[in-house]
Amino acid sequence: MAAAGPSTRASSAAAAAALSRRGRRGRCDETAAAKTGAPGPASGPSLLVLSPPLLQPPLPPRPEESGCAGCLEPPGEAAALPCGHSLCRGCAQRAADAAGPGCPRCRARGPGWARRRARDDGQADSEVLGECARRSQPERCRPRRDGGAAAAGPRPEQEPRAAPAEPDFIFRAPIKLSKPGELREEYESLRKLREEKLQEEKPSEDQIHKLLPEDTETGKRKMDEQKKRDEPLVLKTNLERCPARLSDSENEEPSRGQMTQTHRSAFVSKNNSYSLAFLAGKLNSKVERSQSCSDTAQERAKSRVRAVPGNKAKVTTMTPASNPIIGVLLSTQNNRCVSAPDLTIEKRLPFSSLSSLASLHKPERSVSPESNDSISEELNHFKPIVCSPCTPPKRLPDGRVLSPLIIKSTPRNLNRSLQKQTSYEASPRILKKWEQIFQERQIKKTLSKATLTSLAPEMGEELLGSEGIHSSKEKPLVAVNTRLSGGQVLSEYTGPTSADLDHFPSVSQTKAEQDSDNKSSTEIPLETCCSSELKGGGSGTSLEREQFEGLGSTPDAKLDKTCISRAMKITTVNSVLPQNSVLGGVLKTKQQLKTLNHFDLTNGVLVESLSEEPLPSLRRGRKRHCKTKHLEQNGSLKKLRQTSGEVGLAPTDPVLREMEQKLQQEEEDRQLALQLQRMFDNERRTVSRRKGSVDQYLLRSSNMAGAK
């Protein structure tokens, strides 16, 4: 290895590249000819003496194989390419900088990493290749190694040499990942730990498997013992609470006394009758099922006798005061279906002995076509619907079973309801609830905002509500003392018929008042106790039709008839007007007086000026004449007063003048009372928030604000 540095090698490589290849080859040929004694190219022909092949040294490698692929010179610092060729440092630098192919020999472009490696860190490879080239061709590498000084001089004689020594083996120590046997030791230790854990868990699992069956057997044995101890008590309790428990089928024997709640369909036949406990007044008795239409009285009697004898000691005597069926609605006129039995017969029976209860016979449903029951024909084909609820009864904390009180409805014969009365023996609470429901329905009907399709006469003017509602919707009542010119007398108004009162129980309570008020045949008082019931669609029309059957056919009577029919619909006042102020007259409102076009009063005055104003329609079905409500109300009131003044209701007649003054005074008093009532209600609804009062606003504290 020469001692010259890299700069010397680079300069020698540049100088060698500058020389002509041909001149160098010529000089090499001349030198070889001088050594062998052969003439040069300028001399004449001569024989070439070859050495024997045994003494001939091995041929050196071709320069294309060992030299640079670019300049064909033995590289001092070679760079290996991926294709197998080598380049000197200069050619490798030019190949890396150029955009062309990487290898000038095979035109194979190396990858980027190869080019970067050849450019940057190809020092080690170049040294190895240079050492190989110097060993293989020492004669050709010596002038370049010596700086080119001996290149022009004669070359030393080539001596035969032995085969080139093989390059030294470069040993590189392998990377040690682990020591020998270390992985096996680690695996063995992990396996031992796993086996130890399994050995520790195995005894506990075995113990658990042993204890589980024992615990299960112990729990089952305790449950069986508890069940055996409780079974007699349950049987005893069931027998006490349901002594008349019957089987669900006629072919089965009665059950052992256990109250197994069966949820059957509503159309399944039930053979249970009312239990004795329910008839004895116990609230925890079982609710009975309805009877089937196809069952006969004999079969029910047999099943009842079959279930009763074991429970004779449990029956107690019953008094009428302890009877809990007072809330059940009864009908004394119509026949009953089996789903709603007639309990009035059972109320009259003495409950002191069991034999009377065993022989109790419920009325069978009539199957004849002349039956009063309106649904009997349908129920001949279908089984009756079970009236009792299918949900199990509620159990009280003390263990008693609370059975709900069932109100059974009764089908009514609608053909007979118009001729005969039907009395309801019900509790006052139910009657009060009925009346409340009727009033609520009437209020909803009156306050409805729906568009009217027909103008019923003054149907929207009636309201059931507070005084404020009365003040905005009602019209004051006017009594006009008119005597018919023909001398005819109106028939006495006796109120709604008994058939109409069947639909309204609260009206039947006030019949005595109506009968006491209707004293003379010339007076028609205004019935005002139950306004919502008297005005109900078809019943109202039948009312008007019945109450005027006794009237004559004269025009005056017809006019009075229309006035009376209108007066009967204004029934929202809670008292009847004094009898002394209504002397044989017909009650009308101021609004209804406008509808009279021609009406002869007693003094002969013809009322014609009333026909100038049109008939006002319902409030809900027409537009308001004024933009604001209070102006319209005040305007209508002024118009009414002007109209009454224009008509001049016989100023010479003291009775009419006194009547009008009294009505005006009553109207003013009523308006004042309503205004005061509204002020009082407003003050009562207004909450005083002043400081110091009970309802004052409390300041929000900081902690409450922070919490939010």
Curated annotation (Swiss-Prot):
The modification Phosphoserine is found at residues 12, 247, 249, 339, 368, 403, 409, 485, 644, 693. A zinc finger (RING-type) spans 68-107. The modification Phosphothreonine is found at residues 410, 554. One of its GO terms (cellular component) is site of double-strand break. Pathway: Protein modification; protein ubiquitination. Changing residue 673 to G: Abolishes ubiquitin-binding. Pfam families: zf-C3HC4_3. Residues 1-71, 96-169, 195-262, 491-555 are annotated as: Disordered. It catalyses: S-ubiquitinyl-[E2 ubiquitin-conjugating enzyme]-L-cysteine + [acceptor protein]-L-lysine = [E2 ubiquitin-conjugating enzyme]-L-cysteine + N(6)-ubiquitinyl-[acceptor protein]-L-lysine. The keyword DNA damage applies. It comes from the Eukaryota. Phosphorylated by DYRK1A; phosphorylation increases RNF169 ability to block accumulation of TP53BP1 at the DSB sites. One of its GO terms (molecular function) is K63-linked polyubiquitin modification-dependent protein binding. Its main location: nucleus. CDD domains: MIU_RNF169_C, RING-HC_RNF169, UDM1_RNF169. It is found in: Chromosome; Nucleus, Nucleoplasm. A motif (LR motif) lies at residues 689-701. Its EC number is 2.3.2.27. Keywords: Chromosome, DNA damage, DNA repair, Isopeptide bond, Metal-binding, Nucleus, Phosphoprotein, Transferase, Ubl conjugation, Ubl conjugation pathway, Zinc, Zinc-finger. Belongs to the RNF169 family. The MIU motif (motif interacting with ubiquitin) mediates the interaction with both 'Lys-48'- and 'Lys-63'-linked ubiquitin chains. The UMI motif also mediates interaction with ubiquitin. The specificity for different types of ubiquitin is mediated by juxtaposition of ubiquitin-binding motifs (MIU and UMI motifs) with LR motifs (LRMs). PANTHER family: E3 UBIQUITIN-PROTEIN LIGASE RNF169 (PTHR23328:SF2), RING-TYPE DOMAIN-CONTAINING PROTEIN (PTHR23328). Probable E3 ubiquitin-protein ligase that acts as a regulator of double-strand breaks (DSBs) repair following DNA damage. Functions in a non-canonical fashion to harness RNF168-mediated protein recruitment to DSB-containing chromatin, thereby contributing to regulation of DSB repair pathway utilization. This is E3 ubiquitin-protein ligase RNF169. The lineage of its organism: Eukaryota, Metazoa, Chordata, Craniata, Vertebrata.
